[in-house]
């Protein structure tokens, strides 16, 4: 059972970012000019102390507007993601970076965190690993410097959260580009930062945008990419256990996990164990989607092929049973001329020919 190739969308340049970055450079006001240029003071009758007090007050007012805009943009991002308006959400993340740069400056950890959020957005909302790596890399050194120097536990927690997201983004972006070693290297760093973060929380529950299960799955896939099959299987077994503990043994989240675990077992030539994983996935499909559904048909076909791959004579009946179930379910739900119906029928015919039989007409 081969893993499906991943299509990586690319663009020649990052137009949204380049335009907004240019605007932010024009918008950012040097600190020494903020009161003089925006708020000229000219009260000839005012004392020096009164003038300084007014200048300070105006400087605070000058920065309150971008801060309000930043808070609004952050709320808007969450709402747009909830509404699955991914492109608009990504553009709003760009606004957050620009506003953070204006408020905090290029070298502040909060600006770097905004860049890490943007990188994660390019990865998860847009599926653009090149842009994701670009922005994550530009944020990394700033976050690491602040992490090393901060004395505030609260600040360190937020920096560690940003680093988990940053290294996860880099890892998955490399994985999408079929660079397993680089992916695994960065995901290990994400894992170390998550461990440090959990120690700071002192065992308390921390809700992170990149969950521990997200990271476990990514590490499993990266391990598979570098052919460390035993390690990959250990990560997937952990992910399966965590999902069952959190959501029960009939959640749709388990289907793809069982499929990937079965793929690893097939690569390890443990065909019986692969069949067991696919049987569990099939059972979940039947309970969630019924026996006659495209998803259950797909899982029946995978089970048929897994039984066939074992090469054991005792599994011949199971191969036929699951191929026929799959074809019948596809015909009932998608029609006789659908691609899935035809391709599954073709695979069944090939298996019958290879085994010296003819398909009944």
Curated annotation (Swiss-Prot):
GO-annotated biological processes: response to endoplasmic reticulum stress
GO terms under cellular component: centrosome; cytoplasm; midbody; spindle
Coiled-coil ranges (or none): 67-95, 176-209, 256-283
Native species: Homo sapiens (Human)
Localization of this protein: Cytoplasm, Cytoskeleton, Microtubule organizing center, Centrosome; Cytoplasm, Cytoskeleton, Spindle; Midbody
InterPro entries for this protein: TPR-like_helical_dom_sf, TTC23/TTC23L
Keyword Chaperone: no
Stated name of the protein: Tetratricopeptide repeat protein 23-like
Cross-referenced Gene3D superfamilies: Tetratricopeptide repeat domain (1.25.40.10)
Domain of life: Eukaryota
Gene: TTC23L
Keywords: Coiled coil, Cytoplasm, Cytoskeleton
Keyword Signal on entry: no
Chief place of localization: cytoplasm
